[in-house]
């Protein structure tokens, strides 16, 4: 295991890894007191390299690492990649390409929903992971050998896991299924945190469309404040306070003092004026610019039994193909399919349609039936 703290060592390591067919990647980060995660360690492993990069080392330039992430000749292998990629998007404007996420691949290969790394280490690599350093403050220096070994284990076993899963995907001809999922993880929009959409994260009641307009603006205000000041959203203003502001709609800074969820003394802060400006923007928002909040569409009468049949079909198809149900469809998808033959849901697109969606539509049209044979539930072709 090599600990990299200098630009020269990082360039040399990335040059070596650039000739490998794949490199396994993981990170350790902290975001307890910040909006943006603080990148504390980067773990990398190639066929003959085991490296830990210290991003907190003085004057270390991570450009060679980000160039490696974009090197199309090297597959970047992660387990549950989303948070790692979010960091790379923010820090280095780099999205790994090509990308392989072993958690997604494992769900396609029959290991259940959101399978954990430790499970794959045990089942595919015949190893075990020491969890005793899991709650380490990774921003502290120096780190102990035990902590570094714990971090390194997140990528060393990953090499074997990747090789096993890649072979299974080739054998089952499902590599393109995983590729479709990787396209979502590689889409920059997956990681966009736009202030104008922040209201969707806030669970709040509001009075009519005008209250919603105020919520849109004050949630955007909080998002900008959190990003610019690098503070957790809750440290700027809690959801309860945003909800109360959207309900009560204060008109002056002093009105904020009468809201229970707004921190005492906030009206005297430098942020109070900008918050009230956000309230005013909400009050002035044109009717046509206020978002339309649509609740779940009521199911057509009598459609419940069809939804239940689709649940059974989903279970049958996922067990038959050894794929996690969660990856194929959820209840909301099934309800939409039951109500609309060409519903805009993932289960009717790409490999999901191939595995489940087409049969779901055939079941709905009466071309496929579900029956019982002995102790087994079976699918029966009809003559319609």
Curated annotation (Swiss-Prot):
Entry EC no(s): 3.1.13.5
Pfam families documented for this protein: DNA_pol_A_exo1 (PF01612), HRDC (PF00570)
UniProt cross-references to InterPro entries, sorted A to Z: 3'-5'_exonuclease_dom, HRDC-like_sf, HRDC_dom, HRDC_dom_sf, RNase_D, RNase_D-like, RNaseH-like_sf, RNaseH_sf
SUPFAM superfamilies: HRDC-like (SSF47819), Ribonuclease H-like (SSF53098)
Residues of the HRDC domain: 208-289
Obligatory cofactor(s): a divalent metal cation
Predominant location: cytoplasm
GO molecular function, one term: ribonuclease D activity
Functional description taken from the UniProt entry: Exonuclease involved in the 3' processing of various precursor tRNAs. Initiates hydrolysis at the 3'-terminus of an RNA molecule and releases 5'-mononucleotides.
Protein name: Ribonuclease D
The species this protein was found in: Parvibaculum lavamentivorans (strain DS-1 / DSM 13023 / NCIMB 13966)
Gene behind the chain: rnd
């Amino acid at each position: 295991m090599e600990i990299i703290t200098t630009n020269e060592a990082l360039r040399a390591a990335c040059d070596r890894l650039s000739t490998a067919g794949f490199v396994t990647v993981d990170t350790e980060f902290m975001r307890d007191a910040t909006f943006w995660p603080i990148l504390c360690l980067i773990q990398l492993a190639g066929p003959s390299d085991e490296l830990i990069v210290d991003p907190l080392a003085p004057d270390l330039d991570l450009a060679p690492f980000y160039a490696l992430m974009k090197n199309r000749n090297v597959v970047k292998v992660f387990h549950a990649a989303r948070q790692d990629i979010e960091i790379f998007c923010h820090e280095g404007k780099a999205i790994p390409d090509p990308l392989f996420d072993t958690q997604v691949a494992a769900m396609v290969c029959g290991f259940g929903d959101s399978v954990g790394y430790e499970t794959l280490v045990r089942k595919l690599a015949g190893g075990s992971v020491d969890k005793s350093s899991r709650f380490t403050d990774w921003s502290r220096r120096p780190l102990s050998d035990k902590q570094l070994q714990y971090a390194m284990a997140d990528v060393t076993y990953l090499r074997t896991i990747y090789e096993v899963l890649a072979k299974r995907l080739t054998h089952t001809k499902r590599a393109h299924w995983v590729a479709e999922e990787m396209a979502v993880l590689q889409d920059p929009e997956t990681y966009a945190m736009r202030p104008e959409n922040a209201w969707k994260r806030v669970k709040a009641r509001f009075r009519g469309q005008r209250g919603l307009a105020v919520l849109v603006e004050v949630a955007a205000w909080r998002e900008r404040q959190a990003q610019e000041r690098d503070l957790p959203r809750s440290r700027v203003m809690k959801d309860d306070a945003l909800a109360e502001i959207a309900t009560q709609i204060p008109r002056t800074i002093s009105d904020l003092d009468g809201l229970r969820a707004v921190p005492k003394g906030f009206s005297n802060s430098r942020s109070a004026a900008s918050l009230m400006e956000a309230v005013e923007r909400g009050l002035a928002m044109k009717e046509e610019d206020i978002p339309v909040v649509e609740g779940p569409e009521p199911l057509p009468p009598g459609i419940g039994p069809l939804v239940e049949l689709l649940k059974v079909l989903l279970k049958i198809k996922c067990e038959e193909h050894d794929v996690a149900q969660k990856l194929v469809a959820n209840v909301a998808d099934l309800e939409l399919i039951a109500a609309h033959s060409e519903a805009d849901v993932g289960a009717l697109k790409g490999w999901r349609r191939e595995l489940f969606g087409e049969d779901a539509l055939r079941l709905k049209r009466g071309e496929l039936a579900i029956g019982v044979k002995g102790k087994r539930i079976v699918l029966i072709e009809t003559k319609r």
